[in-house]
Curated annotation (Swiss-Prot):
Tissue: Expressed in thyrocytes (at protein level).
Pathway participation: Hormone biosynthesis; thyroid hormone biosynthesis
PROSITE patterns tied to this protein: EF_HAND_1, EF_HAND_2, FAD_FR, PEROXIDASE_3
One Gene Ontology CC term in the entry: cell leading edge
Gene it is expressed from: Duox1
Binding annotation for Ca(2+) 1: D828, D830, N832, Y834, E839
Name of this protein: Dual oxidase 1
């Protein structure tokens, strides 16, 4: 029951609603857009429909290319020769000017083809050289632009379907010039009150044009003024072109409102819509009647046939022939000026812009004029209408006044153009047929001679036809329809134009079912039709202007004799103001500086970012240094009393440095700001010291010249400071008994006389060269020549003596070292504190050519301090201490005593307290070969090759120079005996036993052999040709990096393909958009790079999916994709992307410039959603493109974000301010938001960024969520320990389910230092351990503060330690060590941390009998001193204790020792080997590992590995440390891989 009630109520409300919604009109309302005026073809005559040809098209290619010169004449030339003539010739039929402009109003109601087509195509008019209007300077390069009109996109495809233009208004006489061509346009014009059209402040005028009403707003060609002000809202888009058209538009506007007002009075119950539609219906009918039955007969001098009724099968479409015929005939009647009069026949004077007064409005200065002071009131408009009704038009012939011919409103940059030339180009654009073909098609008699076109013209002015014939090469078939039609005209349109126009109007009438005479459409009754037929334009004028009917003639389209208010005279150019001349608009005027400044600002983004990064880095370094200063005592308290501040001048090209000069007993010390001793000058008699003072420039320079030293030049702030130091030096010299001289020189001469350190260095270099040339028998030419420019320099070089500091520097040692003291004292025979050439030569001969006995005797004398011929145990301990000074190792006194006792006991001298030389030499008997190859190493001096060969040691890092195994010694001896007499080098066959030091690590007994000369062992012939080595190196490179190369090739192939696809598209396939015609290079570059950038910035996210990479490393994909190189690939992609971004920006800079100088008609084609061509022409300025568009503003912000991110991500700033890098790199979120917005505006093409971005973004977000789920869990620190060398050891809880592998790394954040700043560190714990551990070196502010925070707490609990956030683990290349049968681990500095975990993991797996593919690991630890990372020594010691299977071979390199094999290093080597032989431990580290002094020579080491492991075809090399070290390892691997033997696969990580 309830359901029935609901249905009843619904039906009741529906009936009530239908009763209340009555239709306000009782007839079928005519649409505004022209649809359904013909029911046969609904689209006929609608807005946007195409023109319908009367004659087939005539295009050059039969499709769309217009006919051009030279087939057709130049349009400007044709206009000048045929259509130019004087003004002031009245119409032969006395037609009025009102009829002329009413005809233009009718045409604006019927057709509009002026709208430029898209893409923009130009059919420019080339101006003949010296044209008086357009080329008065005779440049010969003037081109008037002509843009082709809009066409139907479905046409222009083939000769059977040639291009057809479209009509931008309705093709009916339906009042579209009054009400608009669309419903929305009409709504904009309406007031929606009383059925009237909206008016402005004055009811007689419509409101001004608004943005919602897209009126044509061309700039005033006379003044250049533009904008919508002063333009009225009409139905015709170009209704404001002249005041005369405006007056007619105002006439019909006022007439509609008058009709609506009368209807409202007659029918007060009607609403707005009913009133508006009734008034519109009546106005359109009146307009049709006047146009068809009053104006058309006056125009053609023919009466149209009687109305036969509506014919639905008749096509009423506008023809292109009609467009040209009607417009051109009207243009011949346009006068140079227009009168204005009142109802009493008073013709008004017109005040011009130059304050002059003329009798009429000048037409050429009235185009698109705004706010004309003579047309501000309704009376002014009435006066203009009355004046046009009384003024006789120009003669109907082929001539056109200059106001139309030369000063028509110009398109684009030109303020003026030739109207007739433009019309000729329009006809060619329309593809109009020739004059003869048109006559033939319309059934007119053919014309076979030029004189037959217009016999009257031929008789009166035959030269015109002759000139026309000459322009068309006497070929009548080429004569264009427009030119031929004009030549036919004489008082009336010629037969051709008349036939075209009449045919068009008849078809419009008969094919329109809304025609007012059609009594079947229900619009009007017969009485109303009769009333409309009796209404003329004179009636409209009288009704609107309220003038007396006697003030107007009966037919306002003619002025006949006897009609009221005759014109004063036929207007000519005489007495009228001159036309404003042509000017060319510069769209970029005033923008050059701002545009350049904008580009400069964009280019400064990286510089500003660089400056910001530098400031941040400086602040961070300042804070870091302040933290470091807090950890050590201030050095200011160590300043010596009496120090004098000065600047030391070091040479003309060297900067001055601030120093402190201290006078101490017997010496002068020069120190820097940190009190580091720069130089010590000994004051010993009988030296002669010279003090030279400057005598000019403030007398503030001092030169201290001491014999056998380089000079000290000091600059002071003032003379008083210099004088105080000089007095102190005088006193010190007198106190030490030194004589001195003092004089003054000009400062320039003083500095010229000074011997700088650099000059002294050149002298010492010559000294050493000639010294070694005598000792080592080096060729004199190889040693260099003494300076020969002056005898003084030669004498100085020969008499040069070395100071103690120079002697120490030449050995690469410190002057205060005990070794230097002992050596120098021994060599300085005369005790003068300097070594002469002969003294140095004597001791050098012993080291270079002496026997082992002579060398040991020299060593014995050096350390026999009391000179009694015996060395006591205390002296032996002092000697040993001097040996180990270089390593900065401070062994305890007990340890040194233990070493000495062991050496005495080993040699059988345990009962002796003192040793003779014989005893000392006997103690060194096992190291005879070491002493034999000992030399005194001098910095900068190359040792001859033979000495180098002798000095190569028996070690695992070099090729054996002695027979390496007992079973080979006899064979070596036999071969050597056989070849002893041969000049060839002795050879030794290849040894297959491990080298000596490696065998020692396996516990094999080593037998000592005498050194024998032989060539290096070769498994096969070594190809030495550079070409073969290059090929081999290339093969190894491909083998090492085949996965990298493959991935890079695939990635960049896709990137290049995307670039090429977009570049090809916009270069060759995007002509339909027209953008390549505007900016070819810019658009190709910007769109091609945009595609590549979109791909790169999307897929770069995958390189940062750490969890995904760690997982995929364990899959089969790792065989094809080098996941360990993800970070390097990330940097590689980023570097390429920023380069493409710069190119993309450069392309858009070109685009912006070209868009800023492109007219609006072109821009509206390129960006139809952004611009509408309203005739204003002026494009947007450059700043609009940069800062007021979404792509522009986001692009600028993107450049800023990228500049910040890239600068702070550089290696330099990342090391100095990791926090700055961390924070700025989080701009990537902002970056991707901007990228999405930037590409989503669809300015040039539809958005494509999401195609590349979605998949990587989803994967990346998922990976981040995985990290986020675990990295926000607080982890407690179990133990924190501060280790030497600024290393902090953290041991913290292992989260549940945390699985990792040795060599992996994690990211941690300390809650006390911020919860968002994560830093990566390698795990040093082994996977089997219950806790996790990190060793973190204090290398920056964050790690330094971390070290402070984890200082030892006062209690025993770990609760006071700040907690951590942990993210990881993540994989690295070092994780693959177990995949190689033999692996080499090379760690330097803090780069040893990943190997600590690997070593512990390997030993653990071997101890539990776990199957491991890796059979041998060589661990090379490179450190400045063994004390640098003592925590690693503890780990190595643990490994040695647990390594029962000898899986790990550890070698430690101490690089702070002298790098070359000098005497002291030899002795240190002897002591180290002796200590290791006795206690099986290193003297320095306390480990069983082999300790070496210097840097590891990787290439010989890798060579020896091939001998030790001949069956292993691939060895893994893993290095971690500074870039210099990893580069050396990489270089060694590349060199070894040139040989076609064992392959070394290198994986490295820098820190």
């Amino acid at each position: 029951m309830a359901v029935y009630s609901a249905v009843a109520w619904i039906l009741l409300f529906g009936v009530l609603a239908s009763l209340g919604a009555q239709n306000p009109v009782s007839w079928e309302v005519q649409r505004f857009d022209g649809w359904y005026n013909n029911l046969m073809e609904h689209r006929w005559g609608s807005k946007g429909s195409r023109l319908q040809r009367l004659v087939p098209a005539s295009y050059a290619d039969g499709v769309y290319q217009p006919l051009r010169e030279p087939y057709l004449p130049n349009p400007r030339h044709l206009s000048n020769r045929v259509m130019r003539g004087p003004a002031g010739q009245p119409s032969l039929r006395n037609r009025t000017v009102l009829g002329v402009f009413f005809g233009y109003h009718v045409l604006s109601d019927l057709v509009s083809v002026e709208t430029p087509g898209c893409p923009a195509e130009f059919l420019n008019i080339y101006i003949p050289r010296g044209d008086p209007v357009f080329d008065p300077d005779k440049r010969g390069n003037v081109v008037l632009p002509f843009q082709r009109s809009r066409w139907d996109r479905s046409t222009g495809q083939s000769p059977s379907n040639p291009r057809d233009l479209t009509n931008q208004v309705t093709g009916w006489l339906d009042g579209s010039a009054i009400y608009g061509s669309s419903h929305s346009w009409s709504d904009t014009l309406r007031s929606f009150s009383g059925g009237q059209l909206a008016s402005g402040p004055d009811p007689a005028f419509p409101r001004n044009s608004q943005n919602s009403l897209l009126m044509w707003m061309a700039p005033d060609p006379a003044t250049g003024q533009g904008g919508p002000q002063g333009l009225y809202a009409f139905g015709a888009q170009r209704g404001n072109r002249e005041p005369f058209l405006q007056a007619l538009g105002l006439l019909w506007f006022r007439y509609h409102n008058l009709c609506a007002k009368r209807l409202a009075q007659e029918h007060p119950h009607w609403g707005d819509e009913e009133l508006f539609q009734h008034a519109r219906k009546r106005v359109i009918a009146t307009y049709q009647n006047i146009a068809m039955y009053e104006w058309l007969p006056s125009f053609l001098k023919q009466t149209p046939p009687e109305y036969p009724g509506y014919h639905p099968f008749l096509d009423p479409s506008i023809s292109p022939e009609f467009v040209v015929a009607s417009e051109q005939f009207l243009s011949t009647m346009v006068p140079p000026g227009v009168y204005m009069r009142n109802a009493s026949c008073h013709f008004q004077g017109i005040a011009n812009r130059n304050s002059s007064v003329s009798g009429a409005l000048r037409v050429c200065n009235s185009y698109w004029s705004r706010e004309n002071p003579k047309l501000q009131r309704a009376e002014d408009v009435d006066a203009l209408l009355l004046g046009m009704a009384s003024q006789i038009a120009e003669r109907e012939d082929h001539l056109v006044v200059e106001d139309v011919q030369d000063f028509w409103p110009g398109p684009l940059k030109f303020s003026r153009t030739d109207y007739l030339a433009s019309c000729l180009q329009r006809g060619r654009d329309l593809g109009l047929p020739s004059y003869t073909k048109a006559r033939e098609a319309l059934g007119l008699p053919p014309v076979s001679h030029w004189q037959d076109i217009n016999p009257a013209l031929s008789r009166s002015n035959g030269t015109v036809l002759e000139a026309t014939a000459a322009l068309y090469n006497q070929d009548l078939s080429r004569l264009e329809l427009l030119a031929g039609g004009l030549l036919e005209s004489h008082g009336d349109p010629g037969p051709l134009f008349s036939a075209i126009v009449l045919d068009q109007f008849v078809r419009l009438r008969d094919g329109d079912r809304y025609w007012f005479e059609n009594n079947r459409n229900g619009l009007f009754s017969k009485e109303e039709i009769a009333e409309i037929r009796n209404t003329s334009l004179r009636d409209i004028l009288v009704a609107v202007t309220n003038v007396d009917p006697s003030a107007l003639q009966p037919s306002v389209f003619f002025w006949l004799a006897g009609d009221p208010c005759p014109q004063p005279s036929q207007l000519s150019t005489q007495g009228l103001p001159a036309c404003a001349p042509l000017f060319v608009r510069d769209y970029f005027k005033g923008s050059g500086f701002g545009f350049g400044l904008t580009i400069g600002t964009l280019c400064c983004f990286p510089l500003v970012s660089l400056l910001s990064a530098w400031i941040v880095a400086r602040l961070r370094m300042r804070n870091f240094k302040r933290l470091q200063r807090q950890d050590r005592q201030s050095i200011m308290c160590e300043k010596l009393v009496g120090g004098v501040e000065a600047l030391e001048w070091q040479g003309r090209k060297e900067p001055c440095r601030p120093v402190l000069v201290h006078l101490q007993p017997g010496q002068i010390r020069v120190v820097d700001g940190r009190l580091t001793v720069l130089r010590t000058i000994q004051l010993r008699p009988p030296q002669q010291v010279n003090l030279i003072l400057s005598s000019n420039r403030g007398r503030r320079t001092l030169l201290l010249k001491i014999p056998k030293e380089y000079d000290l030049v000091l600059l002071f702030n003032m003379e008083e400071e210099r004088q105080a130091l000089v007095e102190n030096i005088r006193a010190a010299l007198k106190e030490n008994g030194l004589s001195f001289q003092e004089w003054e020189l000009r400062e320039q001469e003083l500095m010229r006389a000074a011997v700088t350190r650099q000059q002294r260095g050149h002298l010492l270099e010559t000294f050493f060269r000639h010294l070694f040339s005598q000792v080592l028998d080096i060729n004199q030419a190889d040693a260099g020549t003494l300076p020969l420019d002056s005898s003084t320099k030669v004498r100085e070089a020969l008499t040069c003596e070395l100071s103690r500091a120079e002697f120490a520097d030449s050995l690469g040692l410190k002057p205060q070292d005990m070794f230097v003291e002992s050596m120098f004292s021994l060599a300085d025979k005369d005790g003068n504190g300097y070594l002469s050439f002969r003294e140095f030569l004597d001791i050098l001969v012993v080291f270079m050519k002496g026997s082992p006995e002579e060398k040991s005797r020299l060593m014995f004398r050096m350390y026999d301090f009391d000179g009694n011929g015996l060395i006591s145990k205390d002296e032996f301990i002092r000697m040993l201490r001097s040996f180990i000074e270089i390593s900065n190792n401070c062994l305890s006194k007990d340890q040194l005593a233990e070493v000495v006792e062991s050496m005495f006991r080993e040699s059988g001298f345990q009962d002796k307290e003192e040793l003779t030389w014989e005893d000392f030499h006997f103690m060194l008997r096992d190291h005879d070969s070491d002493l034999r190859f000992t030399q005194l190493c001098v910095k900068g001096v190359e040792v001859p090759e033979v000495i180098k060969n002798l000095c190569r040691r028996a070690s695992y890092i070099s090729q054996e120079k002695i027979c390496p195994s007992p079973r080979m010694s006899a064979h070596c001896a036999r071969n050597n005996t056989k070849t002893a007499s041969s000049p060839q080098r002795l050879q030794c066959p290849v040894d297959t036993d491990p080298p000596q030091e490696i065998r020692r690590r396996f516990g094999k007994k080593v037998t000592s052999f005498q050194p024998l000369l032989f060539t290096e062992a070769h498994r096969e012939k070594f190809q030495r040709s550079r070409r073969h080595q290059t090929v081999q190196q290339f093969k190894r490179f491909i083998e090492n990096y085949r996965r990298h190369i493959g991935c890079v090739a695939v990635f960049y192939t896709i990137t290049g393909a995307l670039f090429l696809e977009r570049a090809y598209y916009y270069a060759f396939a995007a002509h339909h958009s027209g953008i390549t015609d505007t900016t070819r290079v810019g658009i190709i570059l910007s769109r091609g790079t945009a595609a590549s950038i979109s791909f790169m910035f999307s897929y770069i996210l995958l390189t940062m999916c750490r969890n995904l990479i760690t997982f995929l490393r364990e899959t089969f994909l790792n065989r094809y994709i080098p996941f360990d190189a993800a970070v390097d690939f990330h940097r590689f992609i980023a570097s390429t992307a920023i380069i493409l971004t710069v190119l993309h920006s450069a392309g858009h800079v070109v685009n912006v410039y070209l868009f800023s100088i492109s007219p609006l008609s072109v821009l509206s084609c390129l960006f139809p959603d952004l611009f509408h061509d309203d005739g204003s022409e002026f494009p947007q300025k450059y700043y609009w493109w940069f800062f007021q568009t979404v792509p522009g503003l986001t692009g600028v912000l993107l450049l800023l974000a990228l500049a910040i991110m890239y600068v702070f991500a550089s290696h330099h700033f990342r090391r100095r301010s990791f926090r700055g890098f961390w924070l700025t790199h989080h701009l990537y979120i902002f970056l991707y938001i901007l990228l999405i917005i930037h590409g989503s505006f669809a300015l040039i093409q539809m958005p494509r960024f999401h195609i590349f971005f979605l998949v990587p973004a989803i994967i990346y977000v998922g990976d981040k969520l995985v990290s986020l789920s675990r990295k926000k869990v607080e982890i407690s620190v179990v133990k924190a320990e501060l280790l030497p060398s600024g290393v902090t050891h953290l041991r913290f809880q292992r989260p549940q389910g945390f699985e990792y592998k040795s060599g992996q790394w994690v990211r941690i954040a300390c809650l006390a230092l911020g919860t968002t700043e994560y830093h990566p560190f390698t795990l040093t714990s082994a996977p089997h351990e219950d806790t996790l551990s990190l060793h973190i070196r204090a290398a920056g502010p964050w790690t330094t503060r971390l070290r402070e925070i984890y200082s030892p707490p006062t209690g025993d609990t770990c609760a006071r330690y700040p907690k951590l956030y942990l993210d990881g683990p993540f994989g690295e290349g070092h994780q693959e060590w177990h995949k190689f049968e033999v692996s080499v681990l090379v760690g330097a500095g803090i780069g040893v941390t990943p190997f600590a975990s690997i070593l512990k993991d390997l030993v653990f797996k071997s101890s539990v009998s776990c199957q491991v593919f890796c059979k041998k690991i060589y661990f090379i630890w490179v450190t400045r001193t063994q004390r640098q990372f003592e925590w690693l020594a503890d780990i190595i010691r643990e490994v040695e204790e647990n390594d029962s299977r000898d899986l790990v071979s550890v070698h430690i390199y101490i690089t702070q020792l002298a790098e070359k094999f000098d005497l002291r290093t030899t002795m240190l080597y002897i002591c180290e080997r002796h200590f290791q032989k006795v206690l099986n431990r290193s003297l320095f580290t306390g480990l069983r590992s082999v300790t070496h002094f210097g840097r590891p020579p990787f290439e010989p080491f890798f060579n020896s590995l091939q001998e030790v492991h001949p069956q292993v075809r691939k060895i893994g090399v893993f290095s971690c440390g500074p870039p210099g070290m990893t580069k050396n390892v990489e270089k060694a691997c590349q060199l070894i891989n040139k040989q076609d033997r064992t392959h070394f696969s290198h994986h490295y990580e820098n820190f």
